[in-house]
């Protein structure tokens, strides 16, 4: 979110300008990160930093505050061009080590009743082809969370959506792709899940 605000000296001294809420500090508790731009030449860096923060790690909202005295600053064309940043790999991938991959493969190979849970992270990352291939090659049933519906067609013979509770209770290995074990999935705990289930 990009927003204008009152001039810095008015905000900092709490002088009570018209609609002069300290938006930067007000936004901090409600977003992943808040930034304030104090100089026009820093605008490009601030926008690049905000985008990288928003999409890196766990995605989240970022607030970018541009005070009125920054908005009216003048800049030369050279300064403006210098402040433009090209985002290179805004969300670097996190790659697990070989040992972790090997353990996961062994768990999945030895599973009697594996289950794949697809979450919104899989949808955001546009993994349709990869998850469809995974399900087709392994014949592991899948359960899409609401924001992941459509990654694999609902009429797939591998869909466990119609037997959600039974699938969760019986699965001995649960492969979680792009989802979090939060309240919607009972934090991965029994009785909704098999108490001996292993999670990948």
Give a label for each model feature.
Residues 1-200:
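N-terminal alpha/beta PP-like core and its mobile active-site loop of ThDP/TPP-dependent enzymes
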């Amino acid at each position: 979110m990009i927003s204008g605000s009152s001039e810095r000296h008015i905000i900092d001294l709490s002088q009570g300008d018209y609609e002069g809420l300290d938006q930067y500090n007000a936004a901090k508790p409600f977003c992943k990160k808040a930034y304030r731009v104090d100089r026009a030449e820093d605008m490009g860096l601030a926008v690049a930093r905000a985008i990288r923060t928003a999409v890196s790690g766990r995605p989240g909202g970022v607030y970018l505050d541009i005070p009125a005295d920054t908005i009216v600053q003048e800049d030369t064309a050279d300064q403006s061009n210098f402040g433009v940043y090209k985002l290179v790999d805004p969300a670097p991938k996190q790659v697990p080590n070989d040992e972790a991959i090997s353990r996961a493969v062994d768990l999945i190979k030895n599973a009697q009743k594996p289950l794949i849970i697809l979450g919104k992270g899989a949808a955001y990352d546009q993994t349709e082809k990869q998850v469809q291939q995974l399900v087709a090659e392994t014949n592991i049933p899948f359960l899409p969370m609401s924001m992941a519906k459509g990654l694999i067609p609902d009429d797939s013979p591998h869909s466990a959506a119609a037997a959600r509770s039974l699938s969760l209770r019986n699965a001995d290995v649960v492969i979680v792709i792009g989802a979090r074990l939060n309240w919607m999935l009972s934090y991965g705990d029994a009785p909704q899940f098999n108490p001996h289930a292993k999670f990948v």
